């Protein structure tokens, strides 16, 4: 059995597998946003070579990124063809996940080229200034910007930009623990 056919795709996250310039998933803790994003990017990266930039506003080390989650999901599914280092994650077909913080790299991020998908994790912390520089950087034809976040303030730049005033090319989905097929008793107790 092909491992990709065994990956469970929660109904709320099916739009991750359809082309949209912006894919924005928001909601409370336990909504499976990060896990669903990682699975979708891994599976799509196995089908065709992708350059995937994983970012957040502040990232002082790789440990503060989604690197560990992506690594764990690859190991969970026992996927072959992946090479995992402390800096990046590569597939034998050319797919590459790489990780950068925005706040301390925003000017160097402008020179990053050829990104197919940019995943902005904890997007509620990303400043409007960072969004203004990041969006035009992800300019490859057919490229996408994915954002996942737990809302904090309605004044957060991501909430204003994508939830209250979504661009026409955006799919914006609010999710909760009810959309999470992996929701465990530990989270329920909280």
Regions found by a protein language model. Name each.
Residues 1-190:
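Short, flexible loop motifs at catalytic/binding sites
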């Amino acid at each position: 059995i092909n491992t990709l056919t065994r990956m469970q795709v929660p109904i709320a996250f099916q739009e991750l597998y359809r082309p949209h310039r912006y894919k924005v998933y928001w909601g409370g803790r336990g909504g499976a946003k990060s896990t669903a994003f990682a699975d979708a990017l891994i599976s799509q990266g196995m089908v065709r070579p992708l350059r995937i930039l994983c970012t957040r506003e502040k990232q002082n080390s790789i440990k503060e990124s989604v690197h560990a989650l992506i690594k764990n999901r690859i190991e969970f599914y026992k996927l072959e063809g992946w090479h995992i280092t402390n800096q990046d994650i590569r597939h034998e077909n050319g797919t590459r996940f790489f990780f950068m913080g925005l706040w301390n790299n925003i000017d160097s991020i402008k020179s990053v080229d050829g990104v197919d998908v940019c995943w902005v994790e904890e997007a509620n912390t990303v400043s409007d200034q960072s969004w203004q520089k990041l969006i035009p950087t992800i300019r490859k034809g057919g490229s996408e910007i994915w954002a996942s976040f737990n809302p904090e303030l309605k004044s957060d730049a991501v909430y204003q930009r994508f939830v209250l005033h979504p661009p026409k090319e955006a799919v914006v989905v609010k999710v909760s623990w009810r959309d999470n097929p992996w929701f465990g008793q530990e989270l329920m107790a909280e």
